Structure formats: C-alpha cells, structure tokens
C-alpha cells in the first residue's frame, strides 16, 4: 500500500503550520525519499509455498488367506499327547500369551506417513533503486513550489537535490541483488499397533474359553505377571517406532555489481539539457561545484576501480535420518526369543546378579540408553562466477572532458586549467589503454563440492561387538563398556574443487 497522499483526490488540509500543506509538510513530502529503499529499508519480495501430504494406513479385521489356525478348519480335532500338546498346560500358556495378532489386544496396526514440502523464495534488492520507483521529484512534470527559503526551490533544496547522489551506488553503496530459495522436505513414518502379518491370536476368535491348569496357566500368578510385564508389542512399553527423514535444500544466488554504473542511471547532472543554476558560490556553477563535476571521475572505472560483476550460487542439501522407538524385525532382545535358557557360570553369567542387572537395564533398543541413532548427510555446492573488465571503457561513457567541443574554463587557480587541474587531468590516465594496458576480460568459475556424513548413536543393522581378548585391567574393561554404550560418532568428509578460468584479450 503506497502513500495515500499520492492518490488523486481532494487534499486533506491539516492544521496551519504543521500539517501536510505547511512548510514542513511539503518539505518532508518532497524529500522523504519514496524510493524502493524507503529511507534505508531494502525492498523485499517473499514467496512461500507449503504442501502437506499425509498418508495413513490402518489394517483391521480378520487375517486374510489360508494361513489361519488349522484348528478352525471344519473337521475332527487332532488331540496331542497329554501334558505337552497344544491342549496341555504349556501349550495353552504359549498359545494365549504369544499374541501375534495384528490387533495385539484390540489395537489396530497403523502406519502414518507425512510429507511436508515448504518452498520459500526471497529476493532482496539493495543499493540502487530499480526502475521508475526513484524519487518522484525527478519525474518530468510541473514543479511544485514550496515555501520561500526552505522549500525545494530554495538554496538548500537545490543543493540537496543536486548533491544527494541519485546514482545507482547511492553514495558508494554497491547495488546488490540476492535471491534465496529454501526447499524443506520432511517425511515422517510412525508405526503403531501390532506388527504386520496375518498370524493372529486365536484366543481372540469367538468361542468357548479354554481354562488352563491352576497355578501356572494364563490365569495363575505367573501367567498374569508375564502377560502384563512382558510387553512384546512393537511399541516396547508404549514408545512407538518412528523414522524421520528431513531434507533441506537451500539455494542462494547473489549478484554484486561494483565499479561503473550500468546504463543511463548515472548522475542526472550529466544528462544533456539546460543547466540548473544554483545559488552563487556554493551551487554547481560555483568554483567548488565546477571542480567537483570535472574531477569526480564519471568514467566507468570511477577513479581506477575496475567494473566487476560477481555471481555466487550456493546449494546446500542436508538429509537427516533419525530412528527412535522399537527396533523393527527380529533385532530385538534375544532373551525374548522362545527357546531354552542358556545358563552361564555362577555369579557373573547372565543368570547371576550382575547378568540379570545388565540384561534388564542395558536397553537393547536401538537407542542404546536413550541416544537415538542418527545419520546426517550434508552436501554443499558452491559455484562462483566472477567477471572483471579492465582496460578500455566501453562505449561513449568515458570522460566527458575528452569529447570534442568548446572547453569549459574554470576559475583561475583551482579550475581544470589551473596547476592542480592540469596535473589531475594528465595523471588520471583516461585513455582507453590506460597507459598502454590492453582491454582485458577475465571470467573465473569456481565449483566447490563438499559432502559430509556423520553417524552417531547406535550402529544400524546386525552389527555386534566383535570378540576381543579379555581385558588386562579394570580400566580397559571400563573403557570397552563405555565405548559399547556410547559409541563415538564417525564422520566422513569428501571435498572436490573445480576451477575454470577464461581470459579474453582484444
């Protein structure tokens, strides 16, 4: 929303003296710089797109296919031997407590995948005002007279208008354009409920209850204890397995132009047209004004500085994967696998006090005591292109004092015809060869690619500690234990640099 005072319509008169129609209001309105920087604030354009995609899969109902319980197939029952068959105490206990059903006690298996795509594009322009959005007082049209003395037509107003430097560098500040694109893609997968597979719990099938023997059956003290505390669900005590993958793509392009201002956006006082006389002594027609106008070096090199254009593109891609919660598949605690117990030596084996303590507190989950396994891959691609033009200035943008025409004599002593003026004109080398230097164009491209991968936390996959000789001391034994529970992160870095330089001489 622009300035409401610029919208055509009836003027809104303010109080006398301090309103927008007063002397101060007119002066501020004409000099408040309605340029795109709005008093130093850079123009900014931001575009942001967000795409959220969520996919959820729920499996419920009866297990499909002919892989169900054969006991449900119509036909004569097959009794097993007494005591150890499926109808015995142990068979009933195992059948009722293995609970491999997809609902695992009514909870349906659920898989949620969520993808979030955020794309943001930002463009910042600083330095030179772009296009016709400059100072409105420079637009051709009827002049708006201000109050005498302090208005834009007074001595101070004319001096400010002519010397406020409407050039693209705005008093030395280089024009800069930065474009930045950020692409964030995050994918999260959560698995809750029962492990997938059609091997349901037959005890949930409608039918008569099968009571077990007293004491050791599922209704006895041991059965109830196992059923409540063994928690063979994939959530391992309620914590759902979670896998998060996050990709961040940042692309930034920056262009800086230094040296000569491009195009006809230079100093307006150089444009052909009628001269605007200023007040005597301090205006552009005075001794100091003429000296500054002739020696401020409007050449493309701006006093020897070569025009330079730098374009820099940075591409950063980072991928992070975190796995938390329950280990998937058969990588859980081996002590939960059905089978005969393996007795160890007395005292220090898995059945001793220390073994039982370690087995219960060693946290066989992939987090290894809470530290989640994390894999981070980061790729950085930096491409920089630099172009430098030296030698002859291109086109008719050289020193205006070399253009054929009548000489403009300055005041005696300090003008261009005086001792100082002649000295400056002869040694500033405005010739196209700059004292013999040939015009040269150099283009240089640098491409740097860096890839870094850091793996911390629990090692993924079926990696197990390799057998090692027994520790020689307590310190070595403690060091091995600490490395097992807190592995050091492993970092891998790769870097490649590609430099291309092209030189063109005329």
UniProtKB/Swiss-Prot annotation:
Region annotated Disordered, chain positions: 1-471
InterPro entries from the UniProt entry: Herpes_LP (IPR005030)
Protein name (database record): Epstein-Barr nuclear antigen leader protein
Organism of provenance: Epstein-Barr virus (strain AG876) (HHV-4)
Post-translational modification comment from the UniProt entry: Phosphorylated by the cellular protein kinase cdc2.
Pfam families from the UniProt entry: Herpes_LP
Location relative to the cell: Host nucleus
One GO location term (cellular component): host cell nucleus
Keywords, comma-separated and alphabetical: Activator, Host nucleus, Host-virus interaction, Phosphoprotein, Transcription, Transcription regulation
Phosphoserine PTM sites in chain numbering: 35
Subunit structure as annotated in this protein's UniProt entry: Homooligomer. Interacts with host SP100; this interaction is important for EBNA-LP coactivator activity. Interacts with host HAX1, ERR1 and HSPA2. Interacts with host PRKDC and AKAP8L; these interactions modulate the coactivator function of EBNA-LP.
Family from the record: Belongs to the lymphocryptovirus EBNA-LP family.
Main function: Plays an important role in the establishment of B-cell immortalization by acting as an EBNA2 coactivator. This transcriptional activation preferentially enhances the expression of the major viral protein LMP1. The interaction between EBNA-LP and host SP100 correlates with coactivation of EBNA2 and the relocalization of SP100 from PML nuclear bodies into nucleoplasm.
């Amino acid at each position: 929303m622009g300035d409401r005072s610029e919208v055509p319509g009836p003027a809104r008169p303010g109080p006398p003296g301090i309103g927008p129609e007063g002397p101060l209001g007119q002066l501020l309105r004409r000099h408040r710089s309605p340029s795109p920087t709005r008093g130093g604030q850079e123009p900014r354009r931001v575009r942001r797109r967000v795409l959220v995609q969520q996919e959820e899969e729920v499996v419920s109902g009866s297990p499909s296919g002919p892989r169900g319980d054969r006991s449900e197939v119509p036909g004569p029952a097959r009794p097993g031997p007494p005591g150890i068959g499926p109808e015995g105490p142990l068979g009933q206990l195992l059948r009722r407590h293995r609970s491999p059903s997809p609902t695992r006690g009514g909870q349906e298996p659920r898989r949620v995948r969520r993808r979030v795509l955020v794309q943001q594009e930002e463009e910042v322009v600083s330095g030179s005002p772009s296009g016709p959005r400059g100072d409105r007082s420079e637009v051709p049209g009827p002049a708006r007279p201000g109050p005498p003395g302090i208005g834009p037509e007074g001595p101070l107003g004319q001096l400010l208008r002519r010397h406020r430097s409407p050039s693209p560098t705005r008093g030395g500040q280089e024009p800069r354009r930065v474009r930045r694109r950020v692409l964030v893609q995050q994918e999260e997968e959560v698995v809750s409920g029962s492990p997938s597979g059609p091997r349901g719990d037959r005890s949930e099938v409608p039918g008569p209850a099968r009571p077990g023997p007293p004491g050791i059956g599922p209704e006895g003290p041991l059965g109830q204890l196992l059923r409540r505390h063994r928690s063979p669900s994939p959530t391992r005590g309620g914590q759902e397995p979670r896998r998060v993958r996050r990709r961040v793509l940042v692309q930034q392009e920056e262009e800086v132009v230094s040296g000569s201002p491009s195009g006809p956006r230079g100093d307006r006082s150089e444009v052909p047209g009628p001269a605007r006389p200023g007040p005597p002594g301090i205006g552009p027609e005075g001794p100091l004004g003429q000296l500054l106008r002739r020696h401020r070096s409007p050449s493309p090199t701006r006093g020897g500085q070569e025009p330079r254009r730098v374009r820099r593109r940075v591409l950063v891609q980072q991928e992070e994967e975190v796995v938390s919660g329950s280990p998937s598949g058969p990588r859980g605690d081996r002590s939960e696998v059905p089978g005969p117990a393996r007795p160890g030596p007395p005292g220090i084996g898995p059945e001793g006090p220390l073994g039982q303590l370690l087995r219960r507190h060693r946290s066989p989950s992939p987090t290894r005591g809470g530290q989640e396994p994390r894999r981070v891959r980061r790729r950085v691609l930096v491409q920089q292109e630099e172009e430098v033009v030296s030698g002859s200035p291109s086109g008719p943008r050289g020193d205006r004092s070399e253009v054929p025409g009548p000489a403009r004599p300055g005041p005696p002593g300090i003008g261009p015809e005086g001792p100082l003026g002649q000295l400056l004109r002869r040694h500033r080398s405005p010739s196209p060869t700059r004292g013999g230097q040939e015009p040269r164009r150099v283009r240089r491209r640098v491409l740097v690619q860096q890839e870094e991968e850091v793996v911390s936390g629990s090692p993924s996959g079926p990696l197990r500690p390799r057998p090692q000789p027994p520790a020689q001391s307590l310190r070595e034994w403690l060091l091995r234990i600490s490395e097992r529970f807190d592995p050091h992160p492993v970092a891998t870095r790769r870097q490649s640099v590609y430099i291309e330089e092209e030189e063109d001489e005329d």
